[in-house]
């Protein structure tokens, strides 16, 4: 593989927060005869691994993207009631949170590879202990059913899941999945937290740090409105307000 293609692979791995599993795969193959990386390329991967670990600590503390809340107040009250119900099944609640986490990342960052992988791993290891009848009821109560169908289709199309592994899937192939999955190869893909607002001292005007990221977030909100309308609108304004919190008085 050419140096250019290795660079493309590294960019994709960094962008989708899967540097560690990709690097692990590279290490397992390094003994193969036709598999050759220069010392500089190995150093670049090791640097990317270190930066990914450092960034992960900051990234996971971002309360805005946590799965245990929704930005729509009405839906969030329903979610909290579900999570506070001690009689509900723990595995089913865990599955619900994984679906919400993927949905929130889709709205704010585009298709999230790492989060989809986590959902897929849980499905293959713990699906037998999930009450899918209750889960579907919760998803409909939270208006999440349609975007959950998109997640099912992405798992089948991108990661080779079979229909029998997707108890939630309604059997209807999503026609938009190829267009949605195109985000995976867009190097201009930007995260919602890549833009924030600031105000210079002595200046009454507020400006954004990354106009392209802000426009990307607007386009993403419009793209996924069909799948989760009740949350998409409030999520956009909540993200906007979250960005305003960076303003230095």
Could you tell me what each predicted segment is?
Residues 1-249:
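Conserved NTP-donor binding/palm subdomain of two-metal-ion nucleotidyltransferases/polymerases, i.e.
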């Amino acid at each position: 593989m050419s140096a250019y293609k290795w660079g493309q692979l590294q960019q994709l791995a960094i962008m989708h927060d899967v540097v560690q599993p990709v690097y692990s795969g590279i290490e397992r193959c390094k003994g193969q005869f036709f598999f050759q990386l220069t010392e500089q390329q190995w150093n670049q991967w090791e640097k990317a691994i270190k930066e990914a670990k450092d960034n992960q600590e900051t990234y996971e503390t971002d309360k805005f993207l946590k799965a245990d809340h929704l930005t729509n107040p009405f839906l969030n009250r329903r979610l909290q009631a579900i999570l506070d119900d001690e009689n509900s099944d723990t595995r089913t609640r865990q599955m619900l949170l994984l679906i919400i986490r993927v949905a929130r990342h889709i709205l704010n960052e585009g298709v999230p590879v790492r989060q989809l992988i986590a959902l897929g791993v849980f499905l293959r290891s713990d699906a037998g202990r999930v009450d899918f009848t209750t889960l579907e009821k919760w998803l409909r109560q939270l208006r999440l059913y349609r975007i959950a169908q998109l997640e099912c289709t992405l798992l089948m199309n991108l990661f080779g899941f079979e229909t029998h592994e997707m108890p939630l899937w309604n059997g209807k192939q999503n026609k938009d999945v190829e267009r949605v999955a195109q985000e995976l190869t867009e190097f201009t893909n930007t995260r919602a937290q890549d833009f924030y607002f600031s105000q210079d001292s002595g200046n009454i005007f507020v400006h954004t740090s990354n106009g392209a990221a802000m426009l990307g977030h607007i386009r993403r909100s419009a793209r996924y409105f069909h799948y989760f309308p009740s949350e998409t609108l409030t999520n956009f304004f909540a993200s906007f307000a979250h960005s305003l919190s960076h303003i230095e008085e």
